[in-house]
Amino acid sequence: EMFSNDDDRLRFTQFLLTRCYLVVVSTPSQESAFRIFTVMNSRGLDLLPTDIIKSTVIGSLPKEKQQGYTEKWEGLEELTGRDGFNEVFTHTRTIFVKERQKKTLREEFEEYVLKTVSPEQLIDDYLVPYTNAYVQLKNCEFTATHHADEVNGLLFWLNKTNNSDWMPPAIKFLAEHPNDSEYVLWFIRKLERLASYLLVTAQDVN
């Protein structure tokens, strides 16, 4: 809300100076700080693992690159929504680690992803193509001159399964072969059959 005049701005400033308190909480580790914030944050947006990862990644960039990459990061987040962007990071972790998550997303992302790629590589080579692939897969919006309807029909059923285990391999494949619609159709068809079989037979692949 915008202030209409100087008196309103003055009253607001006086309120901040006399009625608001700044509380500083010190913790021994980033993990404990995250837990404390989650418990104490009764208002406002929840702090997601991606928020912490963002501060680490953007903070590691040279000063002259931070603004540009911040805008690129926020553009991707706007494309998916905060929760959707968090899912992209979960699937990216799975692509790198190739096994079930054993610790927190933030811990494993820092250990297995951030230590193997530079901040620029993470955003340009992984987050950008993986986010674009995620949006197409999640929304059944694969576009191509051939086979788009067939692919999107299969994606509709994949999204109906009771898990998202199919998403990481689909993201990686689509990100690496965005312009080969025939190959994408072949892969998604095989993936849908596998996912359906595992669902119907209640196979445990953990």
Predicted feature locations:
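Flexible coil/loop and intrinsically disordered segments
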Residues: 1-206
